[in-house]
Each structure stands twice: as C-alpha cells, then as structure tokens.
C-alpha cells in the first residue's frame, strides 16, 4: 500500500497533472516588445499565460524557501534513491490515477462532482521545441490549502527527524528503506528529469491555482486566467537537456507500456501520423481560339499527397484481466493476455488465476509456457524477468530474484497487490517478509496447477520441464514431497510408459521394503546391467534413471511414503527369499570362501575392499559394487565430465579412488572353474590373470572407468592370442623400409620448352 505522510496523502491521491490550459492544444502568442520581455514571454507562452498575466501572477505569488535540511533531502531523493530516471513518468501517472480514483469515488455519492466534465483520463503531450512535457488528468484536483498542506509539507516538521534517522550510521539499510517508504515523495521524482516543475490544479471547491518550484524554493499563486482546467491537475516539466529523450513519442509510449499499461483509466499520448490523402489539382481554365473560357468539366484532377495530422492516441489498450473473477474471463482472453506480456507467439500450456488473502492480499495469473527457453539452464540462478510485480496495477519491477524459486523460473505471469509497502523509489520491497508470503503462495499454486494437468498435457510439460522439477526436489525441502508426486521415471514394469513413485509403491511386492533404482546413460544400458538381473528375474520392479540429474534427485529424498530408496549398484540390496534361501546362501559363502579370501588378499589386493558371493547376479560372472556412501558408476561418470571440474580435485579423487566390493556369481562356470584352480593352487598364474580380467570387465559392466586402460587392452590381446592359438611370444613383423626413386624429367616436356623458346 502506498501510504504517505499527512502532507502527501492528497498529492498521491490527486496528482496526475495534465494541461487543459490549451484551447484545442494551441497556445496564443503574445506580442514581443523588448528583449527582456521576449524572454519573459517565452516562459509565459509555455504556461499559456499572457505577459500581463504572468506579471500579475509573480507579483501576487507566495514564495516559500525550502529549509537547508530539505535541500539535503531533495538531493538525496534525486541522486540516491532512484536507480533509473524513467520512473518519474510512472510516479506521475500513478498519482494521476489516484486523483481519478478519488473523484470517481466522490461522484458515486455526489454526481455533481462531475459537473464540469465527465471525462476521466490521463493525457501526455511533449513539446520538443521548448523541451516541455505536460501530463494532465481530470482527477479531483487540489485546493489552495491542499497545495500548502501537501506540496508544502516537505518543508514542515518531521523532516529533520527523518534526515537524522536516515543518515544515522546505526540505522540498518532495511530501517532506512522503511523510513523512506513512509515518506511518500513520488511526485518529486519529476526533479530527476526537470529543472523546474509547474503544477496547475483546479478542485471543485476552490479556484484554479499554480504551484511552481525549481527544487530549491516554491511559489503558490491564484491562476490569473481563471478556470481553464475545468477540473483536475496539470504538471508541466521543464526538462533538463540530458532528459530530452523523454520528449520522443516512442519513448513515452514504451514507458507507459512498461509501467502503466494496466492503470484503470485511459492514457492518451499526443501523436502524429502520416497518411496519403487525395488533393485536388488546381489547373488554369482552358480557353478557345477566340479567347473564350471553356466550361469546366465536372471531374477535377486529383493527386495523392502526404499529410501529417496530430491527435490523441490511447496507449494502454491491454486490460488487467486479473481484476475480474476467473469465471468472467474467456479462455481466449487468457491466451491473448499471455502473448501480450510475454511476446511469445505460442499459446501457453496451462494457467492459474487466483486471489489470495491473509497476511498480504494479492491477485495473480501464472502461466506455464508450451516450450522451455533454449538458454534456461545457461541462465539458471540468474534473475529472470518472468514475473511482473504490480501495486494497484502500476508496474513496479520484474527484476526479482526471489519472487519464485530458481527451478520455477520458467513460469510467466503477474502479481498485483495493494498491500505491498514500497520504499521511495519502489525498486525494493520494504518488508521482505511479505514477499516471502507471496512466494510461498505462488509456489503452492503452481504445484497445484501442475498436479491438475491431464495425461497429454502433463506429457508435454514433462518433456520440456522435467529437469526443473527434479532440481526442485533437490533445492526446495519444504515442497519436496509435493514435487516428488510429479516425478516420472522409466521402469522395468513397462517399456513404453513412465511411472510415478506412487504407482511404483502400489505395485511393490508384499515384503519389499525399498524402492529399487538403477542409473545410467540409457534404458538399454541399465536394463542389461548385472545389478538388475536377479531383481527383475524375481519380479521386482526397478526404476531406470537415464537423465544426468536423476540420481541427484533421488539422493535428495530420504524416502517416499515411508519407503527408502535403494541404488541397486551399491551395497545394501537384500532380497527376501525366505529362511531356506538364506541358509542356502550361507552355504555358498562357505563354499566360495577360499576364492573370496584369495581375491581380497592376493589377486586383487590393492583394487577392492572385499569380495563376496552376490545375491543380485544371474548371468554375469561378477560385478563391482560401490559402498553406500560412495559414487556409483553413473555418478562417477557425471562428476568426471563436469566442464568446470578441477584437474586435481581432492574430493573427487577421494571418491574416485575408493575401493569397492567385488561380487561373484557362484553359479557362473567361470567362477566355479576359478574356485577349483585357487583351491588347487593359489599360485596359479592363469587364475590370477583371469581374476584381473574379471575385475576389469566387471568395472566396465558396472559403469566405472578403468584406471589402467593400457593394461586391460594388453590382457584382452593375450586372450585373443590364446583363443586363436597364437603364441604369446610371437612378435609383430618389422615394417620394411621402401625407398622411393627420384623422378626423372620427362623428355617431352623439355622438347616443348625448347620449341617455345625457338618461336620467341
């Protein structure tokens, strides 16, 4: 809510000043008598006053000097509090809207308030020749006492206290913003661009008065012209030389579109337009031979000429549909509004329109685009201008980092509140706690909207924004479970459809206590992984995580509906096969203990943490399993492929070099043969070589990278030699060196050259 000190209540309620001093926007010239009088007349001409009138006005004007501390405050306002000068127009139009709101409210109980004119509008006119900008409204206007109480209040009590608190080094920046926010000086933004400001105003209960200031002092006087405005206020800005750009129609139109598009009242801009018109061609009358003038023919010749005309053009054509109830807005209106605020050529995928009440009241329309921006993740975490904040339909900013969390940066829309207190420049919120309340409600509404998307709509959404939701699970603990309900993953249950976590839990086996998942680069890779073999064979469903962010996402959730997540590529996978199955497994562990001990203590001594009999393998001979807190093969691949990873990162090196568990399949023929050889002799070189090769193939199958790729290639070559009965000692033949003979010059070429010389 834009509250002011007592002195500024009427100003913000009634200011919006536009000149009706012109009759049909024309100004009469006064005769020029002397050089001094000419300069004075120029000043008068701009205000629509004659020379005698301006002399009368100045002789009777009440002059007021701003106190020294007020000058300090004005400098603070002009030089410090506003980050960009263009907001002066926003402030003045906002004040004009307040003035129009007030007269409209008064007219509801007293129609006579509109006796002078029923028009309710804001008009903006630029005079480039004289570097003037006029802003006129037909609002409530101000009486002489209003001018003294309001525009003069800045020089009254409270200023000294305000400045002392503002300059107090012990006062926090938030407290300073609080003070400024309570001291409503939006009108004085005019001095950001103007050296001199003239306010002409007419209230129904008083005569027309003129207030004039150069920011150092001000005067108040009765307008000698009488009532030229009928009702309302006119502000004339004498623009600084560097502010001349604000006289350009396109600049003014763009600023209205940016800040004041949704003001309740029509905003008009004095615009020129060029059009082709038919114009009669004057011809000399034709004569006969005896000199008689021929009769004119009925049809006259015409030509097309360019003609420039000036007229008022309405510049705020888009209506604030969020002010209406959702059931009063057509679907096509939502689509057109989306396109107008986003400049997106495509229609939105979905929208939500709501109003919120409580600690802070606001209205909002939020949209989900059909396509994600191409640079969404290049700009992830940066301020994205997708949510526009309005206060009473006046644009405040879209430069917010905290209006929505980063993962919802694709959401587009508007938020409009009457309750937000703003600092003097309206560039920062005065009470950040209110913004947090709004943010919380916006997130809930967005998630509810996404939850309600039907099958086809959700599929389209998921294909574009699935990564955002997964990032949300990682970044937003307070909404983690709500976001988790939106997650979709491929699974072993259906090759053609994704599944929700809720649907997975419904299909879980009776004594299954964990949600199984396997991460990799593709569905083919994960569904053929040795880690899922026995689970799938036993009828357990496994989630297939094939996106780079998936494993991070799942790791951020400790559980879902009281079911923990279990990465099947890590330790901890247990399959309840009953007591007899457990006894059988213990028997296998005893049987293969010589092999597992030998692998751990001899063959793979420096490569593995331990060797165990696997419960998860069916077809594969072995697998390499990460510890519960280590990197899986997929995570290792992701971490090593980071574009900004350091060459030697201690943390990365720690995880990458952690020893893992080597699991063997007791039913595989290679493992059985290896057990026989080790039992017979632990010095068997073939067994040692086979164990090393088993470890390396298990490393690759399990998704890890090999540390010794050259050694692995050598061992594969040895296997190839053995399978082809090629001696391991057979050497590669030495390449023969072939010398090339030097080319001899061709005789034919020499003959040709000699013939050419002889001709010369």
Swiss-Prot record:
Keyword Glycoprotein: yes
Source species taxonomy: Eukaryota, Metazoa, Ecdysozoa, Nematoda, Chromadorea
Region ranges (Disordered): 727-760
Gene that produces this protein: enpl-1
Residues carrying the site annotation Important for ATP hydrolysis: 426
Comp. bias regions, Acidic residues: 741-760
One GO cellular component, as annotated: endoplasmic reticulum
Residues the entry annotates as binding ATP: 95, 137, 150, 187
Species assigned in the record: Caenorhabditis elegans
Protein name, entry field: Endoplasmin homolog
